[in-house]
Amino acid sequence: GNSLILGVPGLAKTLLVHSLAQVLNLKFNRIQFTPDLMPSDITGTDIIQDDAATGQRRMVFMPGPVFANIVLADEVNRTPPKTQAALLEAMQEHRVTIQGRTYQLPEPFFVFATQNPIELEGTYPLPEAQLDRFMFEIVMDYLTEEQEIEVVQATTAIQNFQFRHAVTGADIVAF
C-alpha cells in the first residue's frame, strides 16, 4: 500500500523505492515536491497541439508523472496543501480527474512519499485526509557505526545493480 517514509536526507530512501520498482518490474516516477510545484505538474494537463493531417489545433492531454505504477513523492511536505491534494484521488481511487475528465492510473499503483521529520522550516503539515491514505509509516534512521563500516567495506562506488524481476504488476494485482 501507499507508504510514508520518514528520515533525514542521505539515508537512500529514493534508492530504496527505485530499487523496489525495479525488482517488481514496475514503471517508476519521482516527483520532487517544491513550494512552486502545481497540481498539474503532478497529474498532467491539456496542451494545444497542431494536427498535421487537418491543420487544426486541438487540446491533447499530456499525462503527468503520477501515471506510473510506483510514484515517489519526494519531500511531500515541501509543497502547499493545494498541490498535496493532487495526490488524494490518485492514492484513494487510482485515478485522476482533470478538466472534468477522469483518467485511470496503471495497476498496481502505489505512492511512496518521503518526509524529513527534523527540518520543518519551509514545510507544510500533511492534512489528515492525506495521512489516512498511507497504509504504512516507515521510519528510517542512521546506521550504527558498525553498520556503516560494513556498508563501506561492501561497496566502494555507486554500482549499477541488475535486479531479477521477482514478480510482475499483473502478479500483484492478481494477488
Language-model regions, residue ranges each:
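Walker A/P-loop
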Residues: 2-35
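Hydrophobic anchor at the beta1->P-loop junction of P-loop NTPases
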Residues: 5, 72-73
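P-loop (Walker A) phosphate-binding loop of NTP-binding proteins
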Residues: 8, 42, 114
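Conserved Walker
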Residues: 15, 82, 86
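Conserved NTP-binding/hydrolysis module of P-loop NTPases
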Residues: 38-56
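Canonical AAA+ ATPase core
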Residues: 49-54, 79-83, 91-175
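Conserved alpha-helical scaffold flanking the Walker A/P-loop in AAA+ ATPase domains
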Residues: 50-72
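Walker B catalytic acidic pair
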Residues: 74-75, 86
